[in-house]
């Protein structure tokens, strides 16, 4: 406040009555500070006097303060977030969440409640249980995609809003599928009686129009009914093992080509009764009676297509005790506290062309496969290894030029026959208290380590320890590369091509069209095209190409290749050499068709391609077509 006088005087201010709806600070100089009471709006006032000291003249005045209304935010919080994390999934299509909320400016009836899952609005119903409390029920039945998503429970007063959030697994597209279960495998799966079994089939990751094209089916096997005795139900054990496995893959060194590349579909019995839909059991093989039976006549693999016909990979998680196994695209593992280790291992076989790196006493000859995996070899020269591009120094190769050993905090060594004096590099790092702090990066490198499943001696693996030996949730650089190649293949680069000749108005063939049905991120992958081994950069990242007929009607070789920009796949790939990329593991032969007799007479990698009509190669990171234009 301020007063003026018509002559020089000293003005002294005094508060005569203070405010009633706030705190007023008033000084003798007339400066004021006012803080309204919480949630007050309206008018408040105070009175003061001002005195001209030399004249002893006093005047009084009253000041009115107007406090404008400000909308206060509503507040909401979930009463519990128990089990709302990445170790659990929401199976119920209509889950309910208890909330506590408040809003100074509005009654409960003035508030609205909503929910968002993965940025997608979902229908909600709010039920009040008492003042400031209630239940918010969600309708997740129409959720378009599944996955590990963030969810928000929201309250609004029409102007402002507040939310509480959590992150957990949401499923989608849940349906009930009825499958005929064989009653007696001894009479064959194509004869005898069957019993219909109902299974819930749902997406755990993906669904709808998603980027990933590797459809991975998980099947719950031999689950018993809940005994309701306080023990963990089998269905809970299955889901826990399932989520641990998916989380492990998402956290692994293969995550770059797992997360987003895989759609996960789950099948579990509606009424668990302890039976096995695919007739899973052990005892089929004399070399190990504990391994699960998996041959074509040993399990009823047709039920997997009945559950989900578009599966690319199948993992059966079973309550039956046994040793994990993989054959082709199907693997079986026991539901147990470390299921994720077995699953990552078996998935390496199914998806990434990985072999076993552990030593075995299985009584069978497996030497045929010693060189037919991305990660096993009988080659002893590092310069000739199929994984040499991952070796930092070919003159100082881990495993060959220096010995790596697994060490404990007390200084002892795990490796048989070794001690600290014979080891050049100790694998584990420990602090002064004996706590392991990590892996020694000098030891955990790609090299040439002797011993794997195909032989203890004269057989080699690329790293000291990976999941393909077991016990560590890491694939290693070579195996992660194999995993990435499998994912890239499934995006359509391997078998997604459609070809046709292009003709002019007279019917003469003027070109050859290759149309590739692929899905990829150009920030991570680059599609390149070649003619007779020479890249045509003008065609980069085009998925439909027409190659013009050459004027001399010669043999022309048309190739497409994927270049991995993430740095995961770095194997050298000369498109004119069928065997340089992991020794041809990921591609077919160059098949050529001679139709001069009226039907195809096939040749394999012929040196003279002019004697054939056309040829093709599948892989390794794309494909190739050869056209002998003189025959077209």
Question: Residue spans of the language-model regions?
Answer:
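Propeptide-to-catalytic entry region of secreted or membrane-anchored zinc metalloproteases
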Residues: 171-310, 322, 334, 601
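Proline-centered linker/hinge motifs at extracellular inter-domain junctions
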Residues: 22, 71-76, 493-494
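Extracellular acidic, Ser/Thr/Pro-rich low-complexity tracts
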Residues: 1-7, 52, 99-106, 117, ...
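Short pre-active-site segment immediately N-terminal to the catalytic Zn-binding motif
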Residues: 324-344
């Amino acid at each position: 406040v301020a007063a003026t006088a018509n002559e020089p005087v000293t003005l002294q201010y005094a508060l005569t009555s203070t405010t009633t709806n706030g705190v007023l600070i008033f000084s003798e100089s007339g400066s004021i500070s006012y803080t309204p009471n919480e949630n007050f709006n309206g008018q408040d006032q105070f009175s003061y006097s001002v005195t001209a000291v030399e004249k002893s003249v006093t005047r009084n005045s009253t000041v009115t303060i107007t406090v404008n209304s400000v909308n206060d935010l509503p507040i909401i919080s979930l009463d519990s977030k128990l089990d709302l994390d990445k170790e659990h999934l929401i199976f119920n299509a209509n889950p309910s969440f208890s909330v506590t909320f408040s809003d100074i400016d509005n009654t409960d009836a003035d508030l609205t409640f909503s929910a968002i899952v993965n940025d997608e609005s979902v229908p909600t119903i709010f039920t009040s249980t008492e003042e400031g409390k209630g239940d918010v029920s969600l309708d997740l039945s129409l959720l378009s995609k599944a996955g590990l998503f963030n969810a928000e429970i929201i309250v609004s007063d029409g102007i402002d809003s507040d939310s509480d959030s959590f992150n957990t697994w949401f499923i989608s597209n849940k349906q009930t599928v009825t499958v005929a279960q064989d009653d007696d495998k001894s009479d064959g799966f194509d004869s005898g009686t069957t019993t219909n079994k109902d299974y819930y089939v749902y997406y755990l990751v993906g669904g709808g129009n998603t980027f990933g094209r590797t459809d991975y089916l998980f099947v719950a096997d031999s689950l018993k009914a809940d005994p309701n005795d306080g023990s963990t139900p089998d269905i809970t054990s299955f889901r826990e093992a399932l989520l641990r496995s998916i989380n492990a893959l998402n956290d692994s060194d293969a995550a770059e080509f797992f997360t987003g590349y895989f759609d996960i579909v789950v099948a579990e019995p509606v009424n668990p009764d302890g039976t096995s839909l695919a007739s899973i059991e052990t005892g089929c093989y004399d070399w190990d009676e504990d391994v699960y039976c998996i041959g074509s006549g040993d399990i009823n693999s047709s039920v997997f297509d009945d559950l989900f016909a578009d599966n690319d990979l199948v993992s059966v998680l079973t309550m039956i005790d046994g040793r994990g196994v993989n054959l082709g695209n199907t693997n079986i593992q026991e539901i147990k506290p470390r299921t994720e280790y077995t699953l990552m291992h078996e998935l390496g076989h199914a998806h990434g062309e990985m072999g076993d790196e552990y030593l075995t006493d299985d009584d069978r000859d497996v030497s045929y496969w010693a060189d037919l995996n991305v990660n096993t070899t009988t080659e002893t020269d590092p310069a000739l290894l199929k994984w040499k591009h991952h070796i930092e120094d070919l003159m100082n190769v881990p495993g060959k030029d220096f010995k790596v050993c697994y060490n404990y905090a007390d200084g002892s060594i795990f490796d048989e026959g070794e001690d600290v004096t014979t080891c050049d590099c100790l694998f584990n790092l420990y602090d002064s208290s004996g706590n392991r702090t990590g892996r020694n990066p000098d030891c955990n490198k790609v090299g040439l380590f002797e011993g794997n499943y195909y032989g203890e001696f004269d057989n080699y693996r690329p790293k000291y320890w990976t999941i393909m030996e077991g016990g560590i949730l890491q694939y290693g650089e070579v195996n992660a590369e194999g995993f990435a190649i499998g994912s890239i293949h499934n995006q359509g680069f391997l078998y997604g091509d459609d070809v046709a000749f292009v003709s002019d108005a007279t019917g003469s063939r003027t070109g050859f069209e290759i149309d590739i049905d692929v899905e990829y991120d150009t920030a991570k992958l680059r599609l390149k095209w070649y003619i007779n081994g020479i890249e045509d950069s003008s065609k980069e990242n085009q998925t439909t190409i027409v190659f013009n007929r050459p004027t001399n009607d010669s043999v022309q070789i048309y190739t497409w290749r994927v270049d991995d920009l993430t740095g995961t796949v770095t194997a050298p790939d000369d498109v004119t050499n069928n065997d340089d990329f992991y020794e041809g593991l990921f591609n077919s032969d160059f098949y050529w068709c001679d139709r001069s007799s009226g039907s195809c007479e096939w040749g394999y990698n012929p040196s003279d391609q002019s004697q054939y009509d056309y040829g093709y190669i599948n892989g390794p990171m794309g494909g190739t077509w050869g056209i002998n234009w003189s025959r077209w």
